[in-house]
């Protein structure tokens, strides 16, 4: 009984509370990601590789965006009685990058690419299109929690599926 209501509250109320909490952190620190927040999973591995192979230091700006995005995994008080982590929602990453315009533009892009992958899956049958569609479906379903492109393993997995796994043999 109450577990269902607790789960519903968690899934629908926490994103609002934690978005507000982490929005204040971004505003207080005057952080603007300019795309690095939303695409952290793609960008950070490049700098990490350069740091470890060529000893080129990661720019402080990139490290700051990466750190604040990872800090959302820390448990914070979402209400007087509940602590939670990660439920910042996809909107927060777009907010961190370009504030409210970022939310609008980012969600338009997510909608466009979700529709396009759905259409490609319907008209061009194949495991690659279906896999990419599943990634976008996962992103939409879990948009109340976070954005998958901010997680290195998800972003690299997407690149692997899109460009390597189903590469056509000549």
Q: What are these language model-derived features?
A:
Residues 1-110:
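Small-residue-enriched transmembrane helix-hairpin modules in multi-pass membrane proteins
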Residues 83-170:
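Hydrophobic alpha-helical segments
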């Amino acid at each position: 009984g109450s577990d269902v209501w607790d789960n519903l509250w968690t899934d629908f109320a926490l994103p609002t509370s934690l978005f507000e909490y982490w929005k204040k952190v971004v505003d207080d620190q005057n952080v603007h990601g300019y795309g690095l927040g939303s695409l952290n999973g793609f960008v950070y591995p490049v700098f990490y590789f350069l740091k470890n192979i060529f000893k080129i230091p990661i720019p402080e700006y990139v490290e700051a965006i990466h750190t604040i995005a990872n800090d959302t995994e820390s448990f914070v008080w979402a209400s007087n009685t509940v602590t939670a982590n990660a439920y910042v929602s996809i909107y927060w990453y777009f907010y961190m990058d370009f504030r409210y315009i970022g939310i609008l533009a980012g969600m338009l892009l997510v909608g466009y690419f979700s529709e396009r992958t759905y259409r490609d899956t319907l008209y061009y049958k194949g495991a690659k299109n279906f896999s990419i569609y599943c990634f976008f479906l996962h992103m939409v379903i879990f948009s109340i929690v976070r954005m998958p492109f901010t997680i290195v393993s998800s972003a690299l997995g997407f690149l692997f599926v899109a460009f390597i796994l189903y590469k056509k043999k000549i």
